[in-house]
């Protein structure tokens, strides 16, 4: 049980000197992590924990996607933009005491890149590596000496440096990978400000401050991630103090949090999208008229009004309006049930059809109430004769099944990883991302879109890239593989005594600077 465990911690804190402050923070969240191997995971709940265990060559600024040094203290790039040389920090150690150096970085990225690497073959594959197109970008990895790591590219790639700050490019302990093998995902070893202590599935993940950290040490002694699926129970535990922070707030509780002097609310425009994907490998969603009909059938404004308390924007594009390259000239598909019925009749379905609507079992940053969203979409579809049965699975199973294309329609979403449109459009909708296990769960395969996205990746000219991404959004709007639903405001709540935590555009949860203040 978590409550006795916390009482012990609180008692120990109280038994110390008068100056000793509470140094264990319990963070409530909607679901448990799937795994803790940064090269394998694709879900936000896993990244939340990995953010605090691992580090990358470069990192994002605490409040933006500007790139800063991390495990590399500096870097150089050749004039042709093909050779990147990273100068590594000395004196950095993994949590198991082994040394971080260029060979360790070569191992960390090499296991994903080199097919003959002894740890390359893993169940499900390195999906982020694949979906970011890293095999098409990289030519070679090299470690000429302990403090120098070199990456050579096949061709210039504009978002490359930003990609290196993402979780899948984190440094992992080669010794730990060799020791644990397939079980490494539940025995993580990185270089970050917190080290792994234990994982009791669906109860808690416990991290402890890394006392041997190379930089300023974390201010918390312990960091506990506690999964609480029910929104009402999560909020109750926050109110009672069993947890001191939580995210993915149910909008119903926003006013209560604002009115409670013991709590603080954090908000930020979300760099995300919640969407309904139609599997184009399955009839009738291989028919453009059907996909457009579904787009016209869903009342997005009602979703925002009823389930977000106004803390969201209606979506018309796959990327949020906070991101450069957004195409505001696109009008979107208006809510029009009559037009939807006419399109279905034209496609040969005058009486509609039966299908399944898959829905997430847990709240997400872009969809804090997926059950209610699914029910509302189901009701909208019924108005045009589409009889959709809602299907749910456990979170990890859900992700596996949709990535393998078992769904006809599925709700999902995305929070941007690096502040680049490429991270939405190429990762979620390019034809290369439709290879199973896929991030492109619409299984949309447009050669026209692919050419535009590849051109945008190669160009170093921001204005040119922006125009190409606007063109890409026009292609996607025409082909309608998704119903883009919402762009949600990012939210979190903490007790008044918690300080130093900042919401990040990528949704990352870094607790390095978080502390309790009197």
What is the predicted function of each stretch?
Residues 16-18, 304, 383-399, 426-495, ...:
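Extracytoplasmic/peripheral linker and loop segments enriched in polar/acidic and small residues
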Residues 61-62, 156-218, 222, 232, ...:
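Gly/Pro-rich hinge or "lid" segments in bacterial periplasmic/extracellular proteins
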Residues 182, 210-256, 267, 387:
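Ligand-site clamp/hinge motif
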Residues 206-209, 286-379, 445, 471:
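Append "and occasionally in soluble cytosolic enzymes with long acidic Gly/Pro-rich linkers
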Residues 343, 492-518:
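Long beta-strand-rich cores associated with HINT superfamily self-processing modules
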């Amino acid at each position: 049980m978590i409550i006795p465990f916390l009482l012990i911690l609180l008692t120990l804190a109280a038994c110390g000197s008068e100056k000793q402050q509470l140094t264990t923070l319990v963070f409530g969240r909607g679901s448990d992590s799937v795994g803790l191997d940064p090269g394998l995971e694709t879900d936000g709940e896993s990244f939340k924990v990995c953010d605090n265990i691992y580090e990358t060559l470069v990192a994002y600024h605490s409040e933006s996607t500007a790139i800063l040094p991390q495990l590399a203290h500096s870097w150089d790039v050749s004039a042709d933009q093909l050779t990147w040389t990273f100068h590594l920090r000395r004196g950095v150690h993994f949590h198991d005491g082994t040394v971080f150096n260029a060979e360790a970085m070569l191992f960390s990225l090499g296991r994903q890149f080199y097919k003959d690497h002894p740890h390359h073959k893993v169940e499900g594959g390195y999906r982020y590596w694949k979906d970011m197109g890293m095999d098409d970008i990289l030519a070679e990895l090299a470690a000429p000496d302990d403090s120098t790591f070199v990456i050579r590219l096949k061709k210039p790639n504009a978002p490359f440096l930003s990609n290196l700050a993402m979780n899948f490019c984190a440094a992992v302990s080669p010794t730990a990978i060799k020791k644990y093998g397939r079980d490494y995902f539940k025995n993580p070893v990185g270089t970050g400000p917190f080290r792994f202590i234990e994982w009791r599935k669906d109860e808690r993940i416990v991290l402890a401050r890394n006392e041997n950290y190379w930089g300023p040490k974390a201010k918390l002694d312990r960091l506990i991630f506690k999964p609480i699926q029910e929104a009402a129970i999560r909020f109750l535990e926050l109110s009672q103090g069993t947890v001191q922070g939580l995210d993915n707030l149910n909008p119903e509780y926003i006013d209560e949090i604002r009115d409670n002097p013991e709590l603080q609310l954090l908000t930020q425009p979300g760099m995300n999208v919640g969407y309904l994907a139609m599997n184009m490998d399955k009839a009738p969603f291989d028919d453009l008229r059907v996909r457009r009909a579904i787009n016209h059938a869903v009342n997005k404004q009602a979703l925002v009004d009823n389930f977000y308390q106004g803390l969201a924007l209606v979506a018309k594009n796959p990327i949020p309006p906070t991101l450069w390259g957004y195409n505001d000239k696109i009008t979107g598909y208006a809510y029009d049930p009559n037009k939807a019925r006419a399109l279905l009749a034209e496609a040969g379905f005058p009486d509609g059809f039966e299908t399944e609507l898959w829905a997430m079992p847990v709240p997400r940053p872009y969809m804090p109430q997926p059950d209610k969203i699914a029910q509302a979409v189901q009701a909208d579809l019924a108005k045009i004769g589409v009889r959709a049965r809602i299907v749910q699975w456990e979170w990890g199973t859900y992700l596996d099944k949709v990535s393998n294309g078992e769904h006809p329609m599925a709700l999902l979403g995305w929070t941007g990883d690096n502040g680049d449109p490429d991270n939405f459009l190429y990762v979620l909708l390019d034809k290369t991302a439709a290879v199973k296990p896929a991030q492109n769960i619409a299984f949309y395969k447009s050669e026209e879109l692919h050419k535009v996205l590849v051109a945008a990746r190669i160009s170093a000219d921001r204005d040119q890239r922006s125009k190409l991404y606007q063109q890409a959004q026009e292609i996607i709007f025409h082909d309608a593989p998704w119903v883009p639903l919402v762009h949600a405001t990012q939210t979190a709540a903490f007790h008044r005594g918690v300080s130093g935590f900042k919401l990040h555009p990528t949704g990352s949860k870094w607790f390095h600077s978080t502390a309790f203040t009197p």
